[in-house]
Regions:
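Carboxylate/His-rich catalytic cores and anion/metal-binding grooves
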Residues: 116-124
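Hydrophobic transmembrane alpha-helix segments characteristic of membrane transport
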Residues: 95-103
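Alpha-helical transmembrane segments
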Residues: 1-27, 57-95, 125, 129, ...
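Juxtamembrane helix-capping/reentrant segments at transmembrane boundaries
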Residues: 36-50, 104-117, 284, 289
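Membrane interface segments of multi-pass transport proteins and intramembrane proteases
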Residues: 102-110, 137-146, 293
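Peri-membrane helix termini and adjoining interfacial loops of integral membrane proteins
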Residues: 30-36, 132-136, 277-281
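N-terminal alpha-helical transmembrane segments of multi-pass membrane transport
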Residues: 22-27, 31-40
């Protein structure tokens, strides 16, 4: 328990310390976010905001996790697999951001190219999990052998979480405010199940996210970019798979799941009927265009994430 707290505090401090000089560097190099023309009008004001803040978020997570795990004598293959997966997801996101910055428009990797990278990276923790758990998934105290479906489910969860987190990162402070309760639930379930390594890394993610909020709260000084969102989402999915709470991710990650479903429903509806269900997707843009302020949306989504995360922990205990 002490090491989990150490991991959180160390990551928080590191994120705050790394953030200031990195943002100054981004401003000096004119590393700016380009806003989609289809985005709500209010977002035009965000043009020129530095991006790739995920670099110092993930750096804080990796450094604090390694230090804490070494102090706790918990640095093992499981920890390395999680951190290596996080590193490569960060690289994929950074490549996407780099192409957008270089082209001075909001076009990075092609959707197919991005998905291929995510799938290949997701295979790392999937193969490790199969080596440890075979093809068995758990839900509380219950176990289910799903056979050949296991690797498909694992890859789907990790890539899905990565993309869902990315879709959620559309308002100042939204992704981190929604992500913190999700990582808290994942870490709590992992701790209760004896997966201390997963709990420690979850704590690092929470600490770094809290630190990043200082720079990303309205009006944001920096955006995490795909560097941060793809990596944090991929990390959440990876921790859920290795921490054996992959099914409960649908509950404690309910907000990012809803954001993703809103996009799927919007696109499907328009293709089939020519009509849109929402004013704009993802879901947070629908509320924006309905007259809700960014701050209100972030608070309400964060509250929803907290309630769902609490429900997931309770379900884990009761089932």
């Amino acid at each position: 328990m002490i090491m989990i707290a150490v991991s959180l505090l160390l990551s928080l401090v590191l994120c705050l310390l790394l953030g200031v000089p990195y943002i100054q560097f981004l401003k000096k190099k004119n590393v700016e976010q380009y806003i989609l023309e289809l985005a709500p009008e209010e977002h035009a004001k965000k043009a020129g905001t530095p991006t790739t803040g995920g670099v110092f978020i993930i750096s804080a997570i990796i450094i604090s996790s390694i230090i804490t795990l070494l102090l706790a004598e918990k640095m093992d293959t499981k920890a390395l697999v999680i951190l290596i997966t996080l590193f490569f997801m960060t690289l994929a996101g950074f490549q996407d951001d780099y192409l957008k910055i270089k082209g001075r428009e909001n076009k990075g990797l092609s959707p197919r190219g991005k998905l291929l990278r995510q799938i290949l990276i997701a295979l790392i923790p999937t193969l490790y999990a199969m080596q440890c758990y075979g093809s068995v998934i758990t839900l509380g105290s219950k176990s289910f052998d799903i056979g050949i479906l296991y690797p498909l489910l694992s890859v789907f969860i990790i890539t899905g979480a990565s993309n869902a987190y990315n879709l959620t990162d559309g308002l100042d402070g939204l992704a981190t405010s929604v992500g913190i309760p999700a990582f808290l639930a994942c870490g709590t379930i992992a701790f209760l199940s004896g997966h201390t390594v997963v709990a420690i890394i979850c704590a690092s993610a929470i600490g770094a996210s809290l630190g990043f909020l200082k720079f990303n709260k309205p009006k944001a000084e920096v955006f995490m970019g795909d560097t941060g969102s793809l990596a944090l989402g991929g990390l959440l999915g990876t921790l859920a798979v290795i921490g054996r709470c992959e099914l409960l991710l649908a509950v404690f990650g309910g907000v990012i799941v809803a954001e993703t479903l809103s996009v799927i429903l919007q696109v499907s509806s328009f293709k089939l009927t020519g009509k849109r269900i929402f004013k704009m997707s993802p879901l947070h843009h629908h509320f924006e265009l309905s007259g809700h302020s960014e701050v209100r949306i972030v608070k309400e989504f964060a509250l929803a994430s907290f309630v769902l995360s609490l429900a997931a922990v309770i379900l884990h205990i009761l089932i």
